[in-house]
Amino acid sequence: WESKYTININTQMNYWPAEANALPECVEPLERMVAELARTGADVARRMYGAPGWVVHHNTDLWRQAAPIDGAQWGLWPMGGAWLLQHLWDRWDYGREPGYLEKVWPLFRGAAEFFAATLVEDPASGAMVTAPSISPENPHPHGASLCAGPSMDAQILRDLFDRCIAIAGLLGVDADLSARLATLRERLPPHRIGRAGQLQEWQQDWDMEAPEMDHRHVSHLYALHPSSQINVRDTPELAAAARRSLEIRGDEATGWGIGWRLNLWARLRDAGRAYKVLGMLLGPERTYPNLFDAHPPFQIDGNFGGTAGITEMLLQSWGDTVFLLPALPPAWPQGRVSGLRVRGAGEVALEWDAGLLRQARLQARHGGRFRIEYREQPLELELQPGEVATVVPMGGRLFRLA
């Protein structure tokens, strides 16, 4: 809007397919933008909050403005920079390039230092929360959007603190900061399940009273995608609550909103629903004849969100595991794909027939340990740099071919 970058979902969605689809060079301009935002954001942190580090709100532009803009119901949200940093973590995790973490560590450290200085204790729960903030861009049922500690903020902070602790450990630096962040992480508000069985969007159980229950944003489901804090394998109860939230929200949305829902259904391993939502995204109401995504009007976020969603249906890489064909719909009974990347600097090719995996090939760029899973059957691989492993299913298990 107005030739600016909206960084409470839209800019991020544009980069969702980059790493997995072997386009890491496309992230370089975003990395430069984050470094520039850290400079303007440091001025905002100092002058607006009296805090160290740096902060960016929901929108920026060519001049890298970092303060809140437009209405409070959109702008007074301090998590934009922290979310963008997840793409820099992904750039390392998918590529594992030597020296990269040293380059970006000051950006992560500065963002963490800001929140370590500005989180406040919720007198009702004792949790450490952002305040004031909003749940982008959804109003709550009290005629306002401002609140303390919306679910999305805590979810982004969990990822930020975890990344900082991991990077500091790998680099052997800032042990005191890591210890402080670990303590703060334990005091963030937990995921909460509301009275309708949904994942709560706010600390309070307001979801069923919100004036826009079918809102285009699904901010509180960040933990399901693009994060993996909530997933069907490790947190099934929370995954069921996220599913309930999606059902309440509905599939109809803007083009990019449908793109986000596609990725969420893929993470829930609901192949049929993901395929249905993909059909909505590519239908005439949300895709123009030239395949441009329709917000409306044209908004490319939905194109890239859809690309990422198709990838997620075929291959997922989160936590410590590579998931093969996790949400393959019956409409795609056979096919193959190659050149997809996974965390740990691996490259994967897949072939399937009659809806079943035929084989997978994984090549390790730098070597290391990989965990592959197909239909809940895991296989551990230890590979040397450049080594290729071919994996096939037999008798309900995965085997590596000699």
Q: What do the predicted segments below correspond to?
A:
Residues 2-4:
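Segments forming glycine/polar-rich beta-alpha architectures that bind adenosine-containing cofactors
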Residues 7-48, 55, 62-64, 73-94, ...:
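Active-site core of glycosidic bond-cleaving carbohydrate-active enzymes
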Residues 58-71, 138-146:
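Aromatic- and acidic-residue-enriched carbohydrate-binding clefts of CAZyme catalytic domains
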Residues 103, 120-131, 173-177, 324:
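Short, glycine/acidic-rich hinge or "gate" loops at secondary-structure transitions
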Residues 110, 114-167:
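Acidic/histidine-rich catalytic neighborhood
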Residues 117, 272-401:
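Non-catalytic C-terminal accessory modules of carbohydrate-active enzymes
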Residues 133, 181-186, 325-332:
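A glycine-rich phosphate-binding loop feature that marks nucleotide/adenosyl-phosphate handling sites
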